[in-house]
Amino acid sequence: MAIILKNGKSFNKDGVIERTELKIENGFITAIGSKLHSEEADEVIDVQGKLISAGFIDLHVHLREPGGEAKETIATGTLAAAKGGFTTVAAMPNTRPVPDTKEQMEWLCKRIRETAYVHVLPYAAITVGQQGTELTDFAALKEAGAFAFTDDGVGVQSAGMMYEAMKRAAALDMAIVAHCEDNTLANRGVVHDGEFAHRYGLYGIPSVCESVHIARDVLLAEATGCHYHVCHISTKESVRVVRDAKRAGIRVTAEVTPHHLLLCDEDIPGPDANYKMNPPLRSKEDREALIEGLLDGTIDFIATDHAPHTEAEKQKGINAAPFGIVGLETAFPLLYTHLVETNILTLKQLIDLLTVKPAECFGLPLGKLAVGERADITIIDLETEEAIDPQTFVSRGKNTPFAGWKCKGWPVMTFVGGKLVWQKGRE
């Protein structure tokens, strides 16, 4: 079946927006031009002047299945991804059970094939049960379909354990993806160790809790030659460590979340658990350093750390509620409105940070809008302004600090392998 998307616009190879029509056949892009022959298509879709982009890639998502289906499932999480314009996501392993054996990884891959709306890359755990005491069988997990290795949700506390993990990963040409948190410094914290924590008498998580862990790991990465990736970087000290490591030629990459780019602890209105995430919202100076790191290439791409929880869990109060917020359905509108329309990023930079940049970091054949590429495509309305309403989310999680924020840049159609998997108004 041949589909033509007509009356669109996209970036050409020189980074200039131009009129675009695009043909999809057998799951791939087969033609791009300013005017294609509609009679050659089985279906013609008029995108009415909207932006045609390669589908977004999110390499940090919690789909919660198995074991956390009250929060999210592979089906609901990937439909939320499609609604947000994401055509590929990577699923974190802090599920129950953890994908730490060949059999569990095979089960997970089968479940993904059966229920996912978008492409899902499954992470395997670094340690058995994510307990930090015994390494998993990396070779068997890779053979079973693991994308990379991480214990995200907790940091690997033992330097010796991480050193051995990096050696094994390097031998398999696989990445170690790290949640960086030194438990001896975390101090039972629930928010950043700053003015907000002090005002409300809350335990704080100091910046050094993260940066010390990263500093340790980049030296281990240098010693092993492993590709080491830093999850959800959040402090100015961490940015400095990663910048120095890159200058030294160490194979390190890093991601940042939309919420750490847009919010700081000064923005928290009170002890509201929808502002509780790990790492926490840091200082204004940290947020500015993250933006600077994104602009100078220290930080490689943006990932949401989509972390759905039930309403009941988030109503337990800021001390008892779990860490995490949702992000798949709001990431692009928030970033477009508050970084592009404010001239911090260009539209081309933002799209690259959500497409080609994550693909390049992990060697994925994704993220490009070109003839011969897989037809993973999102269509974006850059003009219509709407307020974020958690009750309209297709994710089971409604936990967001951005409720009521007015944004432009809403995805309206998402194609995965040439198949229309989500369209606004046809939910």
Curated annotation (Swiss-Prot):
Zn(2+) 1 binds at H60, H62, D152, D305. The active site is at D305. Its cofactor is Zn(2+). It catalyses: (S)-dihydroorotate + H2O = N-carbamoyl-L-aspartate + H(+). Substrate binds at H62, L63, R64, N94, N278, H309, F323, G324. One of its GO terms (cellular component) is cytoplasm. Keywords: Hydrolase, Metal-binding, Pyrimidine biosynthesis, Zinc. The keyword S-adenosyl-L-methionine does not apply. Zn(2+) 2 binds at D152, H179, H232. It is an enzyme of class 3 (hydrolase). Belongs to the metallo-dependent hydrolases superfamily. DHOase family. Class I DHOase subfamily. Catalyzes the reversible cyclization of carbamoyl aspartate to dihydroorotate. This is Dihydroorotase. It comes from Geobacillus sp. (strain WCH70). The lineage of its organism: Bacteria, Bacillati, Bacillota, Bacilli, Bacillales. The gene is pyrC.
